[in-house]
Amino acid sequence: MTTTEKAKTLRKNATPWENKLWYEFFKSYPVKFRRQQPIGQYIVDFYCSKAKIIVEADGGGHFYDDKIEYDKERDLFLQSKGYKVLHFTNLEIDKNFYGVCTVIDRAVKESI
């Protein structure tokens, strides 16, 4: 499966937290975001080309040692390409959705 095909599958099988961010924030946000966007060998949850911002909705699997190391390597690659990477846990998205959206909005406004 190519990265593009995998991204398409991920879009069709989004987590509840990804769907919440997409349908309740990004879809109507005035600056365009894409979801499950391939960048190099990686697929990022949300991507804004204009602001060079990536937003990740991190589920429980991101807290195992191997995934922590993978995320660090991926973030370093993305940062080397000029992207700012924002990570939010599913719990943050559930319990502080307004705060998460505010952080994203500020980051976009600072970047464009």
Regions found by a protein language model. Give the residues of each.
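Nucleic-acid endo/exonuclease domains
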Residues: 1-112
